[in-house]
């Protein structure tokens, strides 16, 4: 039987040597938001705590400035 190994999580921001997560970088921020608009936790994404705090702040700033929606599904 074939065994499925879970891919090791790593922090993309550490690997790319990012100094600051910008709230205007919408494409990056959307990767860390669910389809309901919630911020994905670091235990799922593998983001380090320092960058997770910056990420949450950047997402909240972008939401406040209406760059990204609070929720995607309005039914």
Curated annotation (Swiss-Prot):
Protein name as annotated: Small ribosomal subunit protein bS18
PROSITE patterns from the UniProt entry: RIBOSOMAL_S18
Quaternary context: Part of the 30S ribosomal subunit. Forms a tight heterodimer with protein bS6.
Family note: Belongs to the bacterial ribosomal protein bS18 family.
Pfam families assigned: Ribosomal_S18
Gene Ontology terms describing biological process: translation
Statement: the UniProt record of this protein carries the keyword Ribosomal protein: yes
This protein's encoding gene: rpsR
The protein's role, per its UniProt record: Binds as a heterodimer with protein bS6 to the central domain of the 16S rRNA, where it helps stabilize the platform of the 30S subunit.
Listed PANTHER family: 30S RIBOSOMAL PROTEIN S18, SMALL RIBOSOMAL SUBUNIT PROTEIN BS18M
Gene Ontology molecular function: small ribosomal subunit rRNA binding; structural constituent of ribosome
Alphabetically ordered keywords of this record: Ribonucleoprotein, Ribosomal protein, RNA-binding, rRNA-binding
A cellular component term, taken from the record's GO annotations: cytosolic small ribosomal subunit
SUPFAM superfamilies: Ribosomal protein S18
